[in-house]
Curated annotation (Swiss-Prot):
GO cellular component terms given for this protein: plasma membrane
Species in which this protein is naturally found: Vibrio vulnificus (strain YJ016)
SMART domains per record: DnaJ (SM00271)
Name of the gene encoding the protein in the UniProt record: djlA
Transmembrane intervals: 7-30
Keyword line: Cell inner membrane, Cell membrane, Chaperone, Membrane, Transmembrane, Transmembrane helix
Membrane topology type: Single-pass type III membrane protein
Annotated localization: Cell inner membrane
Protein name: Co-chaperone protein DjlA
Topological domains annotated Cytoplasmic: 31-287
Chief place where the protein resides: membrane
Segments on the Periplasmic side according to the record's topology features: 1-6
Single GO molecular function: protein-folding chaperone binding
Domain J: 221-287
Length: 287
């Protein structure tokens, strides 16, 4: 944590202006520390005390997402065909073409480098998102999706995901919960559970895939997608649903700095939550 500017500002402020001078000096010192931190992270600012622009934040989030995705894919030593297909499919879902697609591909390749600076990049992501929980959560969920590309999460990938989660400010328990939710979501997706549509799976059928599940299994996965127990009552179900929809609302994420290219993926996530909720609601018989 950089506090040199705060200490120096408070000291000289108190020296020349007493308590009020110290407070003013503390504020000036804080702005100095902030500018220094941004500069060290590689961001250009418009002026003293100002952070990166919205466009800079979105570009950083976009490139970092694909770079870290490449790092996750490389975790077990070799990037599989399924992982490359998943990255390509994500680019398709974002409607990336031309320069944008090349930027995403370059970032993905960068993430596969042996000396990839993961911790530094995660620090840049935190700065780019201003530490907003829902944006950081969306970033983490993208990486979890990448880890599930070939149907299962390898121990090496899990270790990298724990590093990513810690770097973004999430606990191991929070990561494990999201891993369970994502695994359930993939099973639900294969059954055409999102709005009744059968989405193309990125998992290879040669790996066995997920077997066609019974209605009971689909319902169990719906509960896991919402992060609740099967014995949850109507109030608990609604509370979990509203919380997740609030955190993943595409328009809210866009307003907070989500790159516009990722809007479709945010919509898919909210549709996933909605479909799981609708199934539970139908089963429990409440409106």
């Amino acid at each position: 944590m950089q506090i040199f500017g705060k200490i120096l500002g408070a000291f000289f402020g108190f020296l020349f202006g007493g308590v009020f001078g110290a407070l003013f000096g503390l504020f000036i010192g804080h702005q100095f520390d902030k500018a220094r931190r941004l500069s060290q992270a590689g961001f250009k600012t418009a002026g003293f005390g100002q952070g990166p622009s919205q466009a800079q934040r979105q570009e950083e989030f976009f490139k970092s997402a694909f770079a870290v995705m490449g790092h996750v894919a490389k975790a077990k030593g070799q990037v599989t065909k399924e992982e490359i297909q998943l990255a390509s499919a994500m680019m398709d879902r974002m409607s990336l073409h031309g320069e944008q697609r090349r930027a995403a591909q370059d970032a993905f390749r960068e993430g596969k480098e042996r000396d990839f600076p993961l911790e530094q990049l995660l620090e840049r992501v935190k700065i780019a998102t201003s530490g907003r929980f829902d944006l950081l959560q969306f970033f983490l969920e993208l990486q979890i999706s990448a880890a599930f590309a070939d149907g299962d999460v390898h121990p090496s990938e899990r270790n990298v995901l724990h590093k990513i989660a810690r770097g973004l400010g999430f606990s191991s328990e929070q990561l494990e919960r999201r891993l369970q939710m994502q695994e359930a979501a993939f099973r639900f997706q294969r059954q055409g559970g999102f709005g009744g549509q059968q989405h193309q799976s990125h998992h290879s059928s040669s790996h066995g895939g997920w077997q066609q599940a019974s209605q009971t299994d689909r319902l169990a996965d719906a509960y896991k997608i919402l992060g609740i127990d099967a014995n949850a009552d109507g109030k608990e179900v609604k509370r979990a649903y509203r919380k997740l929809m609030n955190e993943h609302h595409p328009d809210k994420l866009m307003a907070k700095g989500l790159p516009p290219e990722m809007m479709n993926m945010a919509k898919e996530k909210s549709q996933e939550i909605q479909s799981a909720y609708d199934l539970i609601k139908k089963e429990k018989g409440f409106k």
